[in-house]
């Protein structure tokens, strides 16, 4: 096989062996030759034939060139009238073909055709060269090769290298070129589940009327649950996408039970979610004569813009909505009898079993429920479980799995060259999405996830300045502010919410588009499961036709060993991880104590059997010895029971180290008569749980960063921040008003005598005392926040101050319980007084 190609005044010859398998095969020519043509006797003929091997050129008779051509299959590159005339006149058959020009520059020949090649600068090049061009561009732009497969996929889909590389053009617009940013698309898929009419379900007619307000038929996953014994008391694990109708499954089983006098409990991991469900259920089911109660363990702190959710009496309630801990508190208190007959318990977000802190508690709660209430129906709900059958088997549940999304989901990947470009891209995406109106008549709306509260505000402000109605939303905001944002988003007055990844589990906005501005949760990469949960928030069947997810990693941005673009590709290529309950030693002690307090186990043998299949870091015998020696449990006639101290510790959800600190602090026997001093419960609370969410004001942070020419952390208690704030040299670099604030900070918070000052806990503890002092003077969290900013340039959100005060009350309640356990009524009464003062 010989390739002929016109190159200006010469015709190049490339003999590359057999024509069989030549297509897309990179070959080294046997030699490189060229001929010169001229017209002789009105015919085109070779008049010079040169062969080049290595650096040596040899001149051959032109007739040799003709012999070679007549013996080989001849392929002509592109059309050339002169060459074609010569071949025809010599009776040499030929075909036309294409070769990759990039390969020839490297001394190779690759035959390509239109279907197997890729367009580059109006030419066709082979796959290998196209891929090498992509790799070179990735390296030049500072991107890791982990992104290569995505570009390779784009190359296959478009067949156009120029188009693929256009994404690196500064003028590239992702809104106008969604096909070039698309990573993949998760389709709805055909559903073969037979529709179920609500009228044909065996539930009370009054409930049917309520359900039919949203349609005559059940959704597919709801039908599957019915087929698997939902109304026959079967324990079920429901695994299905967000917005596929999981919550209603619990209601279909639980509400009829409630109407028969059996309690229906709906449990969530977060107070905000519990409050939302409480409002929904009260609105829906009060008309059926059912009493709805809430149990979340919140205090009664009175504060501007905040909601208090004092716990209702669950004894007389038909439906109880609560947090996991709200219910477990009653079980650990030994008050399981307060529930009367328990019918159905729904565990929402059951994948929280994988959470490092909440997982062991949730696992223990489910086990206690199953032991204490033999006939209850437990329904677990989750959108993300990789090993659902394993979880279902663990809790003796039937698995109902529905893997179809209610709306299709597009996942996009865009590489930003800078933080400014990233923000500009988000602006374009949010603006374009709001202009999209679905077939249901709703504007597209966006959730942007970032990794810090400060960034939620800076991004929202940037969008607002560009005429996009955006709002920052995070845990530091007051209840009324969050509530207003939620309502405005629901009413489509706001197009974009900017929130933190940490709040993802509590965000329930009906968004069509989710943008990941950052791939971190705080300072840690998102896990595969967290990522899956967050992207699942894009697209709701009631509102949208399609969901969209955009990841916008910044090229070159690195956290630890991985770059942001590497992590983006890794997350998009990942599956969810299996869910396993992870215990540490404190978890083992807490759960053993909770099982004894609740009455789940009564003997040591029962305690061992309860954990015989668990891989624990601490043996049950050793764990029992620890809680027994600490005086938390006792044994009489082989029967185990908790002491008053043990019950106090368990219902306070407190680890043994903190409990022992309280016990020793309030015990007069631990103090000599000379050193005996007044026990201050507030001081104990501050030591155990100091205020954390304090930041430098934006103004102070900017001025210091500019003066010192560094990127300074805004977190007040970060070591780098403490080092700078405590330095006398820092003062001279600030304007007078900021100097005054910094002097106030240094004098009032950083003047301790500790050897490791300023890296001791004194600053944090003293700030905590100041906040408490202001609250004891009846100051509102909003006012306290303003005072900290004005006097010290310390920024703390009012919502964070409110939440911390609530946490302080939790600690004071624990101190009171432990004091009562040891009959120290003086300390207990002081705790009651302090709680009342803080609440009011």
Describe the role of every protein-language-model region:
Residues 367, 375-460, 554-556:
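Conserved interdomain linker/interface between the two RecA-like ATPase lobes of SF2 helicase motors
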Residues 227-234, 245-262, 280-282, 367-368:
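Walker A/P-loop NTP-binding motif
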Residues 613-616, 621-623, 629-630, 634-840:
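C-terminal helical accessory/scaffold domains
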Residues 376, 509, 520-569:
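Conserved segment of the helicase C-terminal RecA-like domain
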Residues 247-248, 262-283, 328-329, 383-389, ...:
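Conserved Walker A/P-loop ATP-binding site and its immediately adjacent core
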Residues 1-223, 227, 233-236, 290, ...:
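Helicase-associated low-complexity/disordered flanking segments
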Residues 302-310, 458, 469-472, 477-500:
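Conserved helicase ATPase core of P-loop NTP-dependent helicases/translocases
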Residues 320, 324-328, 334-373, 378:
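SF2 helicase catalytic motif II
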């Amino acid at each position: 096989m010989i390739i002929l190609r016109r190159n200006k005044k010469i015709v190049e010859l490339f003999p590359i062996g057999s024509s069989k398998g030549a297509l897309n095969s990179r070959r080294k020519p046997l030699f490189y030759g060229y001929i010169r043509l001229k017209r002789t006797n009105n015919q085109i003929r070779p008049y010079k034939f040169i062969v080049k091997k290595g650096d040596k050129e040899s001149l051959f008779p032109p007739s040799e060139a003709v012999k070679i051509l007549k013996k080989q299959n001849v392929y002509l590159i592109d059309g050339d009238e002169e060459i074609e005339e010569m071949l025809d006149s010599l009776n040499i058959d030929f075909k036309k073909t294409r070769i990759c020009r990039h390969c020839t520059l490297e001394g190779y020949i690759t035959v390509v055709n239109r279907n197997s090649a890729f367009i580059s600068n109006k030419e066709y090049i082979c796959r290998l060269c196209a891929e090498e061009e992509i790799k070179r561009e990735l390296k030049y732009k500072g991107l890791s090769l982990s992104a290569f497969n995505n570009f390779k996929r784009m190359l296959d889909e478009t067949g156009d290298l120029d188009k693929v590389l256009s994404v690196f053009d500064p003028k590239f617009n992702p809104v106008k070129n969604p096909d070039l940013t698309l990573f993949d698309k998760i389709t709805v898929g055909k559903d073969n589940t037979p529709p179920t009419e609500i009228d044909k379900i065996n539930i009370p007619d009054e409930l049917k009327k309520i359900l039919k307000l949203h349609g005559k038929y059940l959704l597919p996953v709801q039908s599957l649950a019915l087929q698997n014994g939902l109304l026959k008391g079967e324990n079920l694990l429901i695994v299905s996408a967000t917005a596929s109708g999981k919550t209603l499954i619990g209601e279909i089983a639980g509400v009829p039970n409630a109407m028969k006098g059996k309690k229906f409990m709906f449990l969530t991991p977060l107070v905000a979610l519990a409050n939302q469900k409480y409002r929904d259920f009260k609105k829906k089911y009060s008309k059926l004569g059912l009493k709805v109660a809430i149990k979340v363990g919140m205090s009664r702190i009175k504060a501007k813009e905040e909601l208090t959710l004092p716990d209702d009496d669950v004894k007389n309630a038909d439906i109880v909505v609560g947090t996991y801990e709200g219910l477990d508190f009653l079980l650990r208190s030994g008050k399981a009898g307060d529930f009367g007959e328990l019918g159905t318990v729904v565990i929402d977000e059951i994948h929280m079993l994988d959470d490092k802190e909440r997982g062991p508690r949730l696992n223990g709660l489910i086990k206690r429920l199953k032991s204490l209430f033999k006939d209850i129906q437990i329904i677990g709900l989750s959108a993300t479980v990789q090993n659902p059958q394993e979880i279902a088997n663990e809790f003796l549940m039937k698995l109902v799995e529905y893997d179809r999304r209610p709306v299709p989901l597009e996942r996009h990947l865009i590489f930003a060259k800078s933080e400014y470009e990233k923000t500009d891209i988000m602006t374009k995406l949010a603006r374009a999405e709001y202009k999209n109106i679905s077939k249901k008549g709703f504007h597209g709306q966006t959730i942007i996830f970032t990794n810090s509260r400060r960034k939620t505000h800076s991004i929202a402000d940037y969008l607002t300045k560009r005429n996009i109605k955006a709002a920052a939303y995070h845990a530091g905001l007051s209840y009324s502010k969050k509530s207003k944002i939620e309502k405005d988003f629901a009413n489509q007055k706001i197009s974009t919410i900017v929130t933190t990844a940490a709040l993802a589990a509590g965000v329930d906005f009906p968004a069509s588009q989710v943008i990941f501005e950052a791939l971190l949760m705080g300072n840690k990469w998102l896990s595969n499961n967290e990522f899956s949960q967050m992207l699942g928030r894009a697209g709701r069947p009631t509102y949208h036709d399609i969901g969209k997810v955009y990841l916008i990693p910044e090229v070159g941005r690195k956290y630890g060993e991985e770059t942001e673009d590497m992590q983006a590709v890794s997350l998009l290529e990942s599956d969810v991880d299996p869910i396993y309950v992870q215990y540490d030693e404190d978890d083992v002690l807490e759960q053993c104590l909770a099982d004894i307090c609740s009455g789940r186990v009564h003997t040591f043998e029962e305690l061992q059997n309860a954990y015989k299949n668990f891989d624990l870091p601490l043996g049950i015998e050793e764990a029992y010895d620890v809680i027994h020696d600490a005086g938390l449990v006792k044994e009489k006639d082989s029967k185990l029971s908790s002491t008053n101290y043990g019950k106090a510790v368990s219902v306070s959800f407190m680890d043994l180290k903190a409990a022992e600190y309280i016990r020793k602090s309030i015990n007069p026997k631990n103090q000599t008569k000379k050193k005996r001093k007044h026990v201050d419960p507030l001081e104990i609370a501050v030591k155990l749980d100091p205020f954390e969410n304090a930041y430098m004001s934006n103004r102070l942070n900017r001025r210091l960063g500019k003066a010192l020419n560094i990127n300074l952390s805004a977190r007040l208690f970060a070591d780098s921040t403490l080092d700078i704030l405590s330095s006398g040299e820092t003062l001279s670099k600030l304007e007078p008003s900021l100097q005054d604030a910094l002097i106030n900070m240094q004098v009032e918070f950083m003047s301790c005598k500790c050897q490791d000052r300023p890296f001791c806990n004194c600053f944090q503890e003293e700030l905590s005392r100041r906040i408490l002092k202001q609250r004891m003077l009846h100051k509102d969290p909003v006012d306290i926040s303003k005072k900290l900013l004005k006097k010290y340039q310390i920024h703390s959100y009012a919502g964070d101050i409110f939440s911390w005060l609530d946490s302080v009350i939790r600690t004071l309640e624990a101190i009171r319980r432990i004091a009562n356990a040891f009959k120290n009524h003086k300390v207990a009464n002081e705790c009651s007084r302090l709680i009342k003062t803080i609440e009011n």
